[in-house]
Regions:
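C-terminal active-site/capping subdomain that shapes the small-molecule cofactor and substrate pocket
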Residues: 27-122
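Accessory alpha-helical/coil subdomains and C-terminal extensions
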Residues: 1-28
């Protein structure tokens, strides 16, 4: 099971963190919803400060679909309190932004903003 992979950090590492997830690898909304539910089952959303979703392939229609599914699944799981910013440009899309893992960041779900608050390198 991928979600129990020893290469992934322990779930405690996610406490207070912003979880970023690249949705471009999901072939359809049904698969995406199933993956989100599986991630929740394995504790990925426990105690996170926010969820940052990458821009899906398929343009605005795909983005609207994944937004709707995300909010629906979070509501079903009793996780509507988690702020979400979607359609972010990181990972395997264009333009490809880089997110420095471990850097202090801020996610504002109400205004759709994600900000990195400190230098990624010294």
């Amino acid at each position: 099971d991928f979600y129990q992979n020893v290469l992934l950090p322990p779930r405690e590492a996610f406490q207070g963190s912003i979880l970023f997830y690249e949705v471009c690898g999901c072939p359809d909304g049904e698969t995406y919803a199933a993956r989100m539910k599986k991630m929740a089952e394995h504790g990925f959303f426990d105690g996170i400060a926010g969820l940052l979703l990458g821009k899906p392939l398929g343009g605005r229609r795909a983005a609207a679909l994944y937004d709707r599914i995300t909010l629906q699944v979070l509501a079903e799981l009793g996780l509507s309190h988690i702020p979400v910013v979607s359609n972010a440009t990181f990972g395997h899309n264009s333009p490809a932004g880089i997110i420095p893992i471990g850097a202090m960041a801020e996610l504002d779900g109400d205004n759709g903003r994600f900000s990195i608050l400190e230098a990624a390198v010294e």
